[in-house]
Amino acid sequence: MSKIKDDVKKQIEKRRTFAIISHPDAGKTTLTEKFLLYGGAINQAGSVKGKATSKHAVSDWMEIEKERGISVTSSVLQFNYGGYCINILDTPGHQDFSEDTYRTLMAADSAVMVIDASKGVEAQTRKLFKVCTMRHIPIFTFINKMDREAMDTFELLDDIENELGIATCPVNWPIGSGKEFRGVYDRATKSVELFSDTRKGTTQGEVQIVPIDDPSLNGLISEEQKAKLEEEIELQDGAGAELDQEMVSKGELSPVFFGSALTNFGVETFLKHFLKMTTSPLPRKSDKGEIDPMEEGEFSAFVFKIQANMNKAHRDRIAFMRICSGEFEAGMDVFHMQGGKKVRLSQPQQMMASERHMVDKAYGGDIIGVFDPGIFSIGDTLTTSSDKFSYEGIPTFAPEHFARVRQVDTMKRKQFIKGINQIAQEGAIQIFQEFNTGMEEIVVGVVGVLQFDVLKYRLENEYNVDIRLENLPYEYIRWIDNPQDFDLAKLSGTSDMKKVKDLKDRPLLLFVNEWSIRMTQERNDGLVLTEFAR
């Protein structure tokens, strides 16, 4: 381990790397775009929904995302604002892609949770919040869509605390909602921030700041709004939790902000507060203990995402890695721990969704993409340290839906095998082979059924292969942990059990129900089954 240089440390201290999570349609992608607008990364914000002639969201780059208006992959976006270098990881909102979201959260130091003001905490928010708590990262809440009819502010805060089990502390307070949404009250400065027209959110707009006790405020908001604001603030100040930065850092208390991403109201206010309150890159667990980016001078990173064919013209494969320590330089040689050899990281690039630009240098906290000739896997560690180590692995979700997949045109077998293998290596699907059949019979497992649609779409559009999917009745998957103790051909199970193997030749069993699992274990004394591959 080598000591960090002062100039590298200063660069790392500027980094803020966070993920944005939400239930579908809470406004996550719109909020991401507005951050880019304020950071000067785009001149005019597009909207996810709208007329066919409208721009598509900057972070939705895959064709199927543009067609459906949902994010099905995690986009990586970088921009500068207020002296900070910001890396945003925009995650899929749809529950069928929760595995991709989990991997993305592994690369984040904090999370922004977007909640629809009219609906409160929704199903997918709960699931994603659980993943955040497993990582013990700070969680900041942006209550969105205040320009529409909203739940009572106290009800929203109670909903977050009761549903998610986390304390809340509103940093600001909304003034009205729906058509009467005028701005927010900043509790720290005791001033009101009033928002101007932003041309339906396509431009930044101006903010007028007025102290709460300034007489001029009476002409800017109604007497009723002012009286209600003063009453609610008095109640909150008397009964609410104080803003405890240590609790925030541990993920035990969530600072809450209100606004409207669509109209830009409250977005820049949130961004400014968030960047000051959130953390610079955090230490990471490895098999040699924690690696602290503020102390470790050697370069280290781990792969959290692999994506093929981001641009049809390139036909390449990019491995996205989170730099955890040190300084990256283009063309540098690093040791690939899982491959057991040195590799050169070529064509390093940073992304604005599908737009890419080459980078010469990057630092701890940054996300970069490098050309992958097919040697990297999700969770791999790369380092220049002579004291070699591996970062904690990224677990694989057990698939819950299965289908047999065949290509329609037998002459396109080569493209089919290449395509399905590449998509599997990205972690979007898991593929299994039946015993003694090679790749003739392929079974695909996914966490959510929408992933089958994405698989079909991508094979057709990126590899020019039409496929047929035959849904299978299996719901449970178990890897055999001790295959050396059994003759797998003679393994006795229920009639609806299926024997398959994964891409690493590890044997596993598919079951229709839990009864079949119990019966198989009873008939094969000593058989050890696990939900995850080891």
Enumerate the language-model features and the residues they cover.
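Structural and coupling elements of P-loop NTPases
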Residues: M1-R534
